[in-house]
Amino acid sequence: MKKMLVVDGNSILNRAFYGVRPLTTKDGFPTNALYGMVNMIRKQTEATGADGLAVAFDLKAPTFRHGLYDAYKAGRRPMPEELAEQLPVAKELLAAKGFHVLELAGYEADDILGTLARHSGSAACTIATGDRDSLQLVSESVNVLLAATKMGRPVTDRYTPEAVREKYGVEPEKLIDIKALMGDSSDNIPGVAGIGEKTAGDLIARFGSIEYIYDNIDTIDIKPGVRDKLKKDRDMAFLSKKLGTINCDIPIDSDPQSYLLKAPDNFKVTRMLADLEMFKLIDRLGLEISSAASEPRSEEKPVPVCAEDDFDQLMTRLKSDGESYFLWDGEKCRFDLGDKVLVCDCENEGFYPFFVKLLEDRNIKKYTANIKSLYSFAQGCSALCRNMCGDLELEGYVLNPSASSYDALRLAGEYSAAVPTESGDENDCAAASLRRLFAAMNKKIEENGQQKLLYDIELPLARVLSSMERTGFAVDRDGIAEFGSRLGERIADIEREIYSLVGYEFNLNSPKQLGEALFDKLGLPAKKKTKNGYSTDAQVLESLENKHPAVRDILEYRTLSKLRSTYCDGLLKVIGEDGRIRSTLNQTETRTGRISSTEPNLQNIPVRSPLGREMRKFFVARPGCVLVDADYSQIELRVLAYISGDANMIKAFNDNTDIHTVTASEVFDMPPQLVTPMMRSRAKAVNFGIVYGIGAFSLAKDIGVSRSEADEYIKGYLRHYSGVDKYMHDVVEKAKKDGYAETMFARRRYLPELTASNANTRAFGERVARNMPIQGTAADIIKIAMIRVYERLERENLAAKLIMQVHDELIVEAPENEKERVSALLKEEMENAVRLSVGLVADVHSGRTWYDAKG
């Protein structure tokens, strides 16, 4: 053995538990500590290149230290239940990974670490821990990787003898003398009363040990008060040294060769990680779920895998079954026939005629994955997809919107539906699992009451999104290029102005050089400093905006540079030959149910600044057409009124009064006619702040008032809208009881954060519990509206096309002679998407460009 890694299991697991956000399986079993621990040990193993590895754990039983001092570790809080549940699983998982797991009655994990380190011989030994006690073990052949938190971020510091000397001013073995004097409240080691870390460190740096100090207590040069304290607690000092000293000679096998890494049981590791729903970790460790799936259950034989090119025979079989389960990736198409898997080569000249015929057959139910891609394929063939009954990705998303992915094989592992195949190929195993997997997922969807969400919203929406992606959005290429040039000229002017104000040229895009210019050269007050230099983030610069004109110029420089690089240069790269941009519309990316847009993100075109809004001038209708733009008015507030049942809010909406003016009138105790624009603006911030779950601190920052003022605004709001206040309380309590929050259409978001030990994490969970039903319901409503608009356009044989969705806004490209009809259609379908206790209102406008239609 050349290198040995010795891990403090309890310490690393504990750090992972508090450092990783709460994670649970769908059944509620906590997994965050396990996830963090495996990742941390993996990184430590790679960093050290260890060929030997042992993980040490504490036992619950008392140790020899309790025999020395009854109060040792007294008062320490018990391990949180969510962490205790993960401890035995952690040990089993580490053993399956081929690591040596050690624990010994009467001793602590530290003693195991010390003994293995002391006897590591010629092997370089690294101790991985989050406990500084292990620093006493550092030597020329023993280093410590200390996991810590700095500025809210996890870091790992390597301690060599030199690093210990530099930080503490003493040799590593003398750290225990410092602890003997200062004590350790976390372990209830008493030390000498009144002696703190600074005094203890100074004494040991000068005199070397407590033995020397006490042997010469009356003659050494120390303050009289310190001498008195030392004399008074002499026995406690020596007891504390015994308690804090790691025993490096306990009765365990200390031969380094006994701890060589063993071959991992990859099947067991994969099974365990799949059961824990850690599918990203399976990928990261280079494992395959198919390796677990290929291990047959005792009663189950692997199914055969056969190549198929007799498409007439296959069609006859599928017609007879009345259903088909398949996975198509463009190269192969695999069919699960129950008793076998048939693999079709897509390059076979007979495949696509057969496949199109299958997709169009209204009598054969189709169960597959990513039906959006199939709709797109069929549209490209001038064909139709009929009777699409199941999509693994959409069903997985409906059941758990927080999952990392919805890959078929991963879902099979998650729902215990994996079927082994004779080939052992991952894709074959995924296909073989389809029937069993759909049965398991459909049963769960039915149990959750989510059939309407799946069958009336998500499955039909896939066809709409496919059409929108294929249609795309026309843009003015020359206009974007010219706008980018104008931005470039303005950016160059700003650069020159900044250099003139600072007095020299530097790289404006270098945070380090910018920090030096602002804080060293100009002498502005530094707010934050990182290990790489001064912080120059937006928050810091905005706080300095009135301190020097260069800061305003820098903020403008950043805004314009992003506008040019992201929205001018970026968009020019993705314009198709036909002058249209085609964004990918993602149906399974957000936890609230919202649709997202990527490659490029057209939902993120700037709207806050006049210059940003100008980008919308370059999104145009094709010749002879106009853009008809419709967006919901205050949909989230209307949803809040409905789900809270607040009488005042419902009345305000149904009376068609301005909700922000009404709120301002109540919050500021002012007749509506006397409400000023500033009052209305602040009331608007309160209205939407309640929806998004922000508190007084964030509201104060947003509207520029004191925290106490913001708190009064919120209290005034909740006094007037008492139904909202009750909803905010009740919905959190319900989420705590159920483990999830849900929309009016039964879309769920599971919230393990609500049971977290960390107060900040729990507070985050409560905010999500309050706003997810509002945001999620609004997202569901716009999806229903999209389906209604798309089907109505199709049903009435209109040439107009739905081309974009931006949160609460829909955009249709329509021939000029269809403009009025499409405008009326959009308004009607959006306002009648659902029936609430308050009416939905859609504002409709049109124009040649997105800017003209929306502004």
For the regions a protein language model found, what residue spans apply to each?
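C-terminal polymerase-core module
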Residues: 489-496, 500-552, 719-767, 771-773, ...
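Conserved "right-hand" nucleotidyltransferase catalytic core of DNA-directed polymerases
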Residues: 233-347, 360, 366-369, 429-607, ...
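Conserved RNase H-like, two-metal-ion catalytic cores of nucleic-acid enzymes
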Residues: 4-5, 9, 15-54, 70-71, ...
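Function-dense linear segments that define catalytic or interfacial modules
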Residues: 337, 393-422, 428, 433, ...
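Conserved catalytic core of nucleic-acid polymerases
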Residues: 470, 582-583, 587-590, 665-798, ...
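Noncatalytic, basic helical substrate-engagement surface that gates or grips nucleic-acid strands
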Residues: 2-128, 132-158, 236-239, 245-253
